[in-house]
């Protein structure tokens, strides 16, 4: 986990400083817990409207005016899309020889064309298509993705839906500039931070927020045993 801290000299929140690492190892504390604890700290400041107290994280990404980089780390994403357009080119052939040879040749060609047609139809069906591994910069307003061949941003305000589909996986649904629906699944140690920011700012009635299930069960107790207080952010503030 990259070094992350929240706050200034007063009211510092650093998820790694107060943890008793020896005890933490005994209870199975991992890098994932570090990221979850940091996310809890960010959410605590977010709901209190005190994001200005958060220490900005270093980033190579050009930020917008007054944008605050909260985290940056590895990310792999997959796009829900077809890998083909359904087109295929039938192959024609000419065969000469005995009747049985010509019949066999045409049968083989027909089977090959049938296979091409089926493959084209299969490639037309949408599926999750992984992109090259890259990284993500998470701010209070968006997530910026980049890999060797592509860069793009998803703004929380532009989302139609968000869901935390695994401990380190988040799914976004939104519309591109022409208005076409898009779906993106992201695997990243910062997936829970992406979800928390998007949900708290744009989806306050999200079932994972209302149920408190966006945080792992027993996480607060785990923090207590490890010697680190956890902000009370499991449930939305009344």
Segments (PLM) and residue ranges:
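Anionic N-terminal interaction surfaces
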Residues: 2-135
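Acidic, Ser/Thr- and proline-rich intrinsically disordered linker/docking segments
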Residues: 3-27, 31, 38, 63, ...
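Residue-level detector of short, conserved catalytic/binding motifs and their immediate flanks
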Residues: 141
